[in-house]
């Protein structure tokens, strides 16, 4: 019995050492060396303090800020530990009610909008944490932000364009705007 148990335990502890200790340490070390920002969560700092991550959306409710997609996380919006497949089915009446409420709220907050409400402003992403919106959704909000900030709409269009990330190849993905980065650029523009 001991003849069989000793090699089995040796292999078990060796694999635990390799897969649970050595491999994570090597991968973490390489990530810290090659991609230090991403390895730390892609944090964004303002005045030396972390104020968010470019990977997780945030709630912006003031009229002078661009708003992102609604969060689908439970209890607290954009709560990463609570992220899950939380979207309702298209056939669920609760989804229809939530979308109607969001459309009504957005139209009240954006009375000068001249196009239908972009779909991503009223529907959550699969994770409920998406930090991006389409350039069209950002452009749709420009009249409200321009009025609240007393800025010309043309300047905000340029700011949206400057903060639009385009895919490397035009047929892989869509252009997106990171709402946190856009709002930080807007604040920096107002300060400067």
Curated annotation (Swiss-Prot):
Disulfide partners: none
Chief site of localization: membrane
Annotated localization: Cell inner membrane
Region forming the signal peptide: none
Top-level taxon of the source organism: Bacteria
Keyword field: ATP-binding, Cell inner membrane, Cell membrane, Ion transport, Membrane, Nucleotide-binding, Potassium, Potassium transport, Transmembrane, Transmembrane helix, Transport
HAMAP family given in the database record: KdpC
Record-stated family: Belongs to the KdpC family.
Function: Part of the high-affinity ATP-driven potassium transport (or Kdp) system, which catalyzes the hydrolysis of ATP coupled with the electrogenic transport of potassium into the cytoplasm. This subunit acts as a catalytic chaperone that increases the ATP-binding affinity of the ATP-hydrolyzing subunit KdpB by the formation of a transient KdpB/KdpC/ATP ternary complex.
Name of this chain's protein: Potassium-transporting ATPase KdpC subunit
């Amino acid at each position: 019995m001991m003849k069989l148990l000793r090699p089995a335990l040796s292999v078990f502890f060796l694999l635990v050492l390799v897969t649970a200790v050595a491999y994570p340490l090597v991968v973490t070390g390489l990530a810290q060396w090659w991609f230090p920002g991403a390895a730390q969560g892609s944090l964004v700092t303002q005045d030396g303090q972390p104020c968010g991550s470019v990977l997780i959306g945030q709630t912006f409710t003031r009229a002078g800020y661009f708003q992102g997609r609604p969060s689908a996380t439970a209890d607290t919006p954009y709560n990463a530990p609570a992220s899950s497949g939380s979207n309702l089915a298209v056939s669920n009446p609760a989804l229809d009610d939530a979308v109607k409420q969001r459309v009504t709220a957005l139209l009240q907050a954006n009375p000068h909008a001249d196009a239908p409400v972009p779909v991503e402003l009223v529907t959550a992403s699969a994770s409920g944490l998406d930090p991006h919106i389409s350039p069209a959704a950002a452009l749709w909000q420009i009249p409200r932000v321009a009025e609240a900030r007393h800025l010309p709409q043309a300047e905000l269009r340029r700011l949206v364009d400057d903060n639009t990330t385009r895919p490397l190849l035009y047929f892989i993905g869509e252009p997106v705007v990171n709402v946190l980065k856009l709002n930080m650029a807007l604040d920096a523009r107002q300060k400067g």
